[in-house]
């Protein structure tokens, strides 16, 4: 009986077949297009210009660190917000000028934040130009050997 009828929130009864047909407008199952665990990664179309990130050689180290702290917390993608903000809270204060420049290039030189996430989690191989000391440090941070909960960004 339960499988045949579903009581809607307004108290109206609707046959299960009607619900399953109206569930998707096209009546196609989404599994026809992707498989579980598949990475959907398309190349950027050639007509989409990605602006070059401006190099800031005269920026003071303290100003650069403050900017990177902000940019690490505000990626627009929760996964990277959590990974990068906790990474920066732990390591940025100890970075020298060269390491800070490497980190700047890593988070701002890549046009797609998903690339950073996939590289850091070893889902995709890291390209040689981004396989630096900082990326290796980030990969170790992502492994979370200390089993620290990272469900929110650290306080400022």
Swiss-Prot record:
Q: Name one GO cellular component term.
A: mitochondrial matrix
Q: Which Pfam families does the entry link to?
A: Sdh5 (PF03937)
Q: Which SUPFAM superfamilies match?
A: YgfY-like
Q: Which GO terms describe its biological process?
A: mitochondrial electron transport, succinate to ubiquinone; mitochondrial respiratory chain complex II assembly; protein-FAD linkage; tricarboxylic acid cycle
Compartment annotation: Mitochondrion matrix
Where is the major localization of this protein? mitochondrion
Boundaries of the annotated transit peptide in chain numbering: 1-24
Q: What keywords does the record list, in alphabetical order?
A: Chaperone, Mitochondrion, Transit peptide
Oligomeric form and interacting partners: Interacts with the flavoprotein subunit within the SDH catalytic dimer.
Q: Which HAMAP family does this entry report, sorted A to Z?
A: SDHAF2 (MF_03057)
Function summary: Plays an essential role in the assembly of succinate dehydrogenase (SDH), an enzyme complex (also referred to as respiratory complex II) that is a component of both the tricarboxylic acid (TCA) cycle and the mitochondrial electron transport chain, and which couples the oxidation of succinate to fumarate with the reduction of ubiquinone (coenzyme Q) to ubiquinol. Required for flavinylation (covalent attachment of FAD) of the flavoprotein subunit of the SDH catalytic dimer.
Q: What is this protein called?
A: Succinate dehydrogenase assembly factor 2-B, mitochondrial
Q: Which organism is it from?
A: Drosophila erecta
């Amino acid at each position: 009986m339960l499988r045949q009828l579903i009581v809607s929130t307004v108290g109206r009864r609707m046959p299960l077949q009607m619900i399953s047909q109206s569930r998707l407008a096209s009546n196609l199952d989404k599994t026809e297009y992707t498989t579980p665990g598949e990475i959907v990664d398309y190349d950027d179309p050639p007509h989409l210009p990605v602006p070059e990130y401006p190099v800031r050689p005269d920026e003071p180290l303290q100003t650069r660190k403050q900017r990177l702290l902000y940019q690490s917390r505000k990626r627009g993608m929760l996964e990277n917000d959590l990974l990068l903000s906790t990474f920066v809270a732990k390591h940025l204060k100890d970075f020298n000028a060269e390491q800070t420049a490497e980190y700047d290039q890593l988070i701002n030189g890549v046009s797609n934040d998903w690339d950073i996430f996939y590289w850091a989690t070893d889902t995709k191989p890291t390209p040689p130009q981004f396989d630096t000391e900082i990326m290796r440090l980030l990969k170790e941070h992502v492994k979370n050997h200390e089993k620290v909960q990272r469900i929110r960004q650290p306080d400022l």
